[in-house]
């Protein structure tokens, strides 16, 4: 089974450029330096249609869905509750209206409690409102695979735990590719879950150390441990110019850019 992956956004929490703060070290003339907040689209296609799974709903989701010409989603996976990964959740409303069906979303216990406190109206009509809910909630747990059905066939996602400052985030393995957008470390079970992957899309926030994200050097160290055939760095801050960063990386490692597509 070959899946197609689209980097919907590869920027850090403020994106690139940032309001009032600009482009940082990034060349504004290179389109690959314009970065929306991180998200990943996974697609499986056959003669009957396409199955689509989205990872995270960043604040830029509306533009991301328009650019990728997404008119339906069979499932949405949430890596964790931080604003840059959840605050575009209301943009799923258009998908629900178009499909005339609730959008299936998958969250772990901690993420669900925070997201439902912030966006409860997406899951249940609040008192005094006439607006129907737009989401159907499903619980997920690290280490337990999820099968999401659709017209193009089933997509299997294996969530795995990641250390992300004072919380745990989730990474996801889809067949030969794994996605680790926000992390500072991996527990042993998650290292085992990454065994034998071909492609790893992995957090590399900046050159300087950070308390809850891999630096570029830490990402490269972990890539050396996991040993994917190919690695793609994401969640890139404004001090990481695309061409300057790429020139420093090993041949099997490259920076992500918005709209990048991978098959695995």
Language-model regions: role of each:
Residues 33, 58, 183, 209-216:
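A conditional alpha-helix N-cap/helix-loop micro-motif detector
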Residues 60, 82, 184, 205, ...:
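Catalytic metal-binding/acid-base residues of hydrolase active sites
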Residues 1-180, 189, 246-264:
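Binuclear metal-dependent hydrolase catalytic cores
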Residues 143, 187-264:
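Binuclear metal-ion centers of metallo-dependent hydrolases, dominated by the metallo-beta-lactamase
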Residues 159-160, 180-182, 202, 233-234:
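Thr-Gly-centered strand-to-loop micro-motif
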